[in-house]
């Protein structure tokens, strides 16, 4: 049976490296599923979860919180390069909750000051924190 080699890399190093049956990720255009023998492709990723069904289990799925980046598929290798990414088991939930609260506070401040740049940054920070919290629930 064919399989995929999946690796997730950030500036801090390798976050994930395993063999998989399927990888599902959210691109900026929508969700994409990658199976073995997929055509070569490079796509930008949205801030979202990546689901990886491993070859060593019919039921186990690995979840990775990815904060944007790109995904390249070539020769049954799926490479995800992201500014930051965390496996569900590595997420510090209290820290993610604090980041969520901080982002919500910054959004309110930005709205009060009509600061569009701060609002945009705080909204992205909120999305990242919520993504990490959601992915941690799969662990």
Curated annotation (Swiss-Prot):
Chief location of this protein within or outside the cell: membrane
Subcellular location: Cell membrane
A single GO cellular-component term on record: proton-transporting ATP synthase complex
InterPro entries: ATP_F1_dsu/esu_C_sf, ATP_synth_F1_dsu/esu, ATP_synth_F1_dsu/esu_N, ATP_synth_F1_esu_C, ATPsynth_dsu/esu_N
Keyword Ion transport: yes
Keyword terms, alphabetized: ATP synthesis, Cell membrane, CF(1), Hydrogen ion transport, Ion transport, Membrane, Transport
A single GO molecular function term of this UniProt record: proton-transporting ATP synthase activity, rotational mechanism
Pfam families to which the protein is assigned, alphabetical: ATP-synt_DE, ATP-synt_DE_N
Keyword Transmembrane: no
Superkingdom of the source species: Bacteria
UniProt membrane topology term: Peripheral membrane protein
Protein purpose: Produces ATP from ADP in the presence of a proton gradient across the membrane.
HAMAP family (UniProt xref): ATP_synth_epsil_bac (MF_00530)
NCBIfam families cross-referenced by the UniProt entry: ATP_synt_epsi (TIGR01216), PRK00571.1-3 (NF001846)
Known partners and oligomeric status: F-type ATPases have 2 components, CF(1) - the catalytic core - and CF(0) - the membrane proton channel. CF(1) has five subunits: alpha(3), beta(3), gamma(1), delta(1), epsilon(1). CF(0) has three main subunits: a, b and c.
Record family assignment: Belongs to the ATPase epsilon chain family.
PANTHER family associated with the record: ATP SYNTHASE DELTA/EPSILON CHAIN, ATP SYNTHASE EPSILON CHAIN, CHLOROPLASTIC
Designated name of the protein: ATP synthase epsilon chain
Organism: Enterococcus faecalis (strain ATCC 700802 / V583)
Lineage of source species: Bacteria, Bacillati, Bacillota, Bacilli, Lactobacillales
Gene that produces this protein: atpC
């Amino acid at each position: 049976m064919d399989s995929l080699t999946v690796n997730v890399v950030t500036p801090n190093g390798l976050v994930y490296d395993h063999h998989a049956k399927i990888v599902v990720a959210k691109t900026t255009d929508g969700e994409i599923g990658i199976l073995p023998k997929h055509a070569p492709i490079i796509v930008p990723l949205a801030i979202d979860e990546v689901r990886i069904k491993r070859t060593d289990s019919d039921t186990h799925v690995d979840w990775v919180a990815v904060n944007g980046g790109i995904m390249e598929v070539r020769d049954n290798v799926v490479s995800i390069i992201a500014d930051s990414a965390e496996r569900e088991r590595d997420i510090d939930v209290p820290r993610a909750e604090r980041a969520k609260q901080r982002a919500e506070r910054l959004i309110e401040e930005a709205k009060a000051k009509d600061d569009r740049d701060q609002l945009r940054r705080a909204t992205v920070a909120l999305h990242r924190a919520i993504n990490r919290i959601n992915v941690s629930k799969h662990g």
